């Protein structure tokens, strides 16, 4: 879910062209991307793509074709996978599980009643990322020569660390949490493209990549990263999902700019609420996160035969379509001036 910082970020978020990321390393929140693919790449009645053995392949389709498109533009990708979540996140994860279970019941009922539009809508909320699916994604990345990092805890924290120390230019996620973890830059809409349907409306909008620079954000708001984290706690994070009643992003900003720290806010209801959350531990999760100390990422040669064997022979992908994508990628790499010919 992440923190709803959008009202504070809209003024500094800049739309970019993917071509501007050529030769730059982008650390992608793997779970965030895979869940996007699982939610959006589905059949006519909302069912996920599967192979002949019943194994879900929607995430592999999205991972392969979107990565090919990005690599063809000379963008260097690193996927960062979640490890064990902080214990404070268990409540949020349990709530997400219940939402998925309810969505599945509504999906099945809509199917039975022939309400296909509703069925497709509910289906998007049922996505589950199982261990074999994560392993399949890692296998595909290895065959594509794309490095991945296994984080010990939150993947976004390790991705942000890579951005902070300069191994990656930016992190990529739909959530804003990377900024709370200290990422120098966050890119949204990197792994999605085209048009997006607005919730509960028959209206589609263009989806364009955007970049948020942490320094610009903090300067524009005249706050520190520590104060940004306190603002997030007031709004509600994955570690205190309820937040504080009646407190949105703009009111939280006003309170922190006035009082500087949560403990100093002279509002009785907030002080009472602070007694029921471990806000210092939440601060530490963001400001002193457990991360993989990545020093270098290694981009390897692509294994075209291995990709065809894995996707086409083992997971029932179209050999013609996979071959076409690989040929397009190879041609783009040949004419690239970025020195990425080592991928082949």
Q: Which sequence ranges carry the predicted segments?
A:
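Noncatalytic, basic helical substrate-engagement surface that gates or grips nucleic-acid strands
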Residues: 3-12, 20-164, 184-186, 192-193
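Hydrophobic/aromatic ligand-binding patch that stacks against planar heteroaromatic rings
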Residues: 69, 161-162, 178, 231, ...
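Active-site-adjacent pocket scaffolds in enzyme catalytic domains
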Residues: 181-184, 248
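Mobile, glycine-enriched helix-loop/loop "lid" segments at the mouths of ligand-binding/catalytic clefts
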Residues: 187-208
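Non-catalytic nucleic-acid-binding/docking modules located in mid-to-C-terminal regions
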Residues: 3, 12, 16-22, 37, ...
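Glycine-enriched alpha-helix->loop->beta-strand junction motifs that scaffold or abut catalytic
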Residues: 167-169
